[in-house]
Amino acid sequence: MSIVVKNNIHWVGQRDWEVRDFHGTEYKTLRGSSYNSYLIREEKNVLIDTVDHKFSREFVQNLRNEIDLADIDYIVINHAEEDHAGALTELMAQIPDTPIYCTANAIDSINGHHHHPEWNFNVVKTGDTLDIGNGKQLIFVETPMLHWPDSMMTYLTGDAVLFSNDAFGQHYCDEHLFNDEVDQTELFEQCQRYYSNILTPFSRLVTPKITEILGFNLPVDMIATSHGVVWRDNPTQIVELYLKWAADYQEDRITIFYDTMSNNTRMMADAIAQGIAETDPRVAVKIFNIARSDKNEILTNVFRSKGVLVGTSTMNNVMMPKIAGLVEEMTGLRFRNKRASAFGSHGWSGGAVDRLSTRLQDAGFEMSLSLKAKWRPDQDALELCREHGREIARQWALAPLPQSTVNTVVKEETSATTTADLGPRMQCSVCQWIYDPAKGEPMQDVAPGTPWSEVPDNFLCPECSLGKDVFEELASEAK
């Protein structure tokens, strides 16, 4: 089924509700995607792009229901990737002599995928035009490396529609085609996810290319993307967002992600986050266990953040494999204007944190001091983690911090209540872990200064995860 975009322009693409992986398995398309193809019917009939190769037969059959294939005068391929040009082989088998307009680099890519050098290719460059009748022209604009060397955009005069290729798109499937018809929160989340994970490496090219396009002084009433919605309501809003995202974007946000074998590094991550929040309550802090989180959501949060803390246990003297893989991906994304710090726990020997610090620096992050803990962090080690978080908050602050009274309050409470008043320390009879009322157990929201009698009944030993009934009064303090 086709959808009228504007006047004689129809959407003839394909929705893909089920797709969950893109670029292999590197991009999770949690809300599906669409492959947008457009049919322009003027004195000349023009098809702009096709769809993903897995929908080739369905696409050609649907297109045949819209138009006699022999009446298609021109095919424009803005991008040679298989989710754009995948149905070319099926289509060209029916109309083998139809001219294909694309960049020189696209010919190499198309032949590399379809192996038909005999097709009627016509090379276009920025500023070239194609007359399609009724006083309208197509104007071509090369956009190399946004995000492939062959990429270009196509502008239709008269209707003032920019067929923008991958730019301004999103992997987002909905029965509605236009931006003003869909859930706005979902839409802009997917726009930012798309930019963060696909276009970030090319941010330095985004601003000059947008400036070049605006320099043509052409009105833009609609932006018709290759994936997701068509921008008809205030289409320049997404252009303005791209200019913002391309300018070394950051929010007052810190992302923490880690991998852990025995929860030791997780304990460090939680304590660091507590220290950050104590010192700068205005900053947004997001924590992810990489083994249980959507990788693309982590990368989107890194893109949004002013800094990232990455944690890893040591395994065979190196970092955990999932951490190594994601840091390698961050290297390729070439984030700018961001700070980083490495942390992690180890046993008899370390090595992972130092290695991780080097990799983060190589990825272009401005490095802050790293933090290491041996074995499971005790209360003193967790306090060091909290202090590390406090120092990170101070170093990474984007504005003067509010004066904190946390330390003053703790000191006053400690001096007002003696250890003796809090009762005896308690020892786990299974693993020998000791509960000290003066220190509490912040990981379970048991505040310093909490007597054992006031510890909640659902308390679990941090070492062996058994309940309160296995605890006994420490022998040295028994009367």
UniProtKB/Swiss-Prot annotation:
Record's cofactor remark: Binds 3 Fe cations per monomer. Binds 1 FMN per monomer.
SUPFAM superfamilies tied to this protein: Flavoproteins (SSF52218), Metallo-hydrolase/oxidoreductase (SSF56281), Rubredoxin-like (SSF57802)
Residue ranges occupied by any Rubredoxin-like domain in the UniProt entry: 423-474
Principal location class: cytoplasm
Pfam families: Flavodoxin_1 (PF00258), ODP (PF19583), Rubredoxin (PF00301)
Limits of the Flavodoxin-like domain: 254-393
Alphabetically ordered keywords of this record: Cytoplasm, Electron transport, Flavoprotein, FMN, Iron, Metal-binding, Oxidoreductase, Transport
Binding residue positions for Fe cation 1: H79, E81, H147, D166
Superkingdom of source: Bacteria
A molecular function (GO) term: FMN binding
SMART domains: Lactamase_B
Cofactor(s) it depends on: Fe cation; FMN
Stretches the record annotates as Zinc metallo-hydrolase: 30-210
Annotated HAMAP family: NorV
Subunit structure: Homotetramer.
Physiological role: Anaerobic nitric oxide reductase; uses NADH to detoxify nitric oxide (NO), protecting several 4Fe-4S NO-sensitive enzymes. Has at least 2 reductase partners, only one of which (NorW, flavorubredoxin reductase) has been identified. NO probably binds to the di-iron center; electrons enter from the NorW at rubredoxin and are transferred sequentially to the FMN center and the di-iron center. Also able to function as an aerobic oxygen reductase.
PANTHER family per UniProt: ANAEROBIC NITRIC OXIDE REDUCTASE FLAVORUBREDOXIN
Name recorded for this polypeptide: Anaerobic nitric oxide reductase flavorubredoxin
Organism: Shigella dysenteriae serotype 1 (strain Sd197)
Gene from which this protein is expressed: norV
